[in-house]
UniProtKB/Swiss-Prot annotation:
Name under which the protein is recorded: Cytidylate kinase
Family: Belongs to the cytidylate kinase family. Type 1 subfamily.
Annotated binding of ATP, by residue: G10, P11, A12, S13, S14, G15, K16, S17, T18
Gene: cmk
Pfam families linked: Cytidylate_kin (PF02224)
Lineage, broadest ranks: Bacteria, Bacillati, Bacillota, Bacilli, Lactobacillales
GO cellular component: cytosol
MF GO annotations: ATP binding; CMP kinase activity; dCMP kinase activity
Taxonomic superkingdom: Bacteria
């Protein structure tokens, strides 16, 4: 059966990762959470007290500490920096609030995009992020751009944080998400924007299963051509 590349882009907490994981599992494809890679880079930068002025040092850290993925017995995706499991630390608020400036560093993006493209070249893949359809996989057969209201996305992040034992303030999350939207869409390198041939889908008020079904139907039509 023909295998394709599925690119899912969108702003923070638009449902990208949740949807992408399910689709990858259903199709037997590789799932790559590119956001986790940038979070891992941010985690490294913060651990070493680096700032936006330290781009070269951050890239050096990435050269010396490989970012890789594993799978827990319950199916949860694990993220490693070197041999250290950073799955949960990279989801903490400090990382979340700093990932935009780290991911805007051209040398960091260049290194991680090259790694993402290497992984994608190995076969069927579902990849989610902010520049997958425009930069990482511009040739992807299916490109989806997910959006949702700031209020709904803040509510999702609020519930997710509480479930992981991370303190959360709903109003503050709304402010942080709106601020991150602005930063991500206005950065000079690979800004958040839909690919010209992406299918837009507003997930506000729509369940995950409906979003998955919509994307899988589009994918099957391409595969069956």
């Amino acid at each position: 059966m023909k295998q394709i590349q599925i690119a899912i882009d969108g702003p923070a907490s638009s449902g990208k990762s949740t949807v992408a994981k399910i689709i990858a599992k259903d199709f037997g494809y590789t799932y790559l959470d590119t956001g986790a890679m940038y979070r891992a880079a941010t985690y490294l930068a913060l651990r070493h007290h680096l700032t936006e002025e330290d781009a070269t040092e951050i890239v050096d850290l990435l050269n010396n500490h490989s970012v890789s993925f594993g799978r827990a017995e319950d199916g949860e995706q694990l993220v490693f920096v070197g041999d250290v499991d950073v799955t949960h630390p990279i989801r903490e608020n400090e990382v979340t609030n700093n990932v935009s400036w780290v991911s805007a560093i051209p040398q960091v993006r260049e290194k991680l995009v090259a790694l993402q493209q290497q992984i994608a070249a190995q076969g069927g893949i579902v990849m989610d992020g902010r520049d997958i359809g425009t930069v990482v996989l511009p040739q992807a057969e299916l490109k989806i751009y997910l959006v949702a209201s700031v209020e709904e996305r803040a509510e999702r992040r609020y519930k997710e944080n509480l479930s992981k034992g991370i303190p959360a303030d709903l109003e503050k999350l709304k402010e942080e998400i709106a601020e991150r939207d602005y930063k991500d869409s206005h950065r000079e390198v690979s800004p958040l924007r839909p690919a010209d041939d992406a299918i837009h889908f507003d997930t506000t008020g729509i369940g995950i299963s409906e979003v998955v079904a919509f994307i899988e139907e589009k994918a099957k039509k391409i595969i069956d051509k």
